[in-house]
Amino acid sequence: MSADYDITETLDVKGASCPMPVVKTKSAIDDLAEGEILEVLATDSGSMSDIDGWASGTAGVELVDQEEGDDVYKHYVRKTK
């Protein structure tokens, strides 16, 4: 699915546990321009619900997609404003 997205930056938070994937995602999103997409790579299964919940409750971001693969969880987050 990632081929459908023009990924601006990739954030590798593999090995980090809650709340660090969300904290680092927020920091990285703050540095992007409107419309740009951040790919987040995580190994914490909790990141699936954590990043979804954060994006749902945060103005200016949209969770475009999430993928679960070989021990890596991928999240695609767009900055909307």
From Swiss-Prot:
Q: Which UniProt keywords apply?
A: Plasmid
Q: Where is the active site?
A: 18
Disulfide bonds, which pairs?
Answer: none
Lineage top rank: taxon: Archaea
The cross-references to Pfam families, in alphabetical order and at most eight, read: TusA
What family name appears in the similarity comment? Belongs to the sulfur carrier protein TusA family.
What is the name attached to this protein's record?
A: Putative sulfur carrier protein VNG_5061C/VNG_5236C/VNG_6059C/VNG_6467C
Originating organism: Halobacterium salinarum (strain ATCC 700922 / JCM 11081 / NRC-1) (Halobacterium halobium)
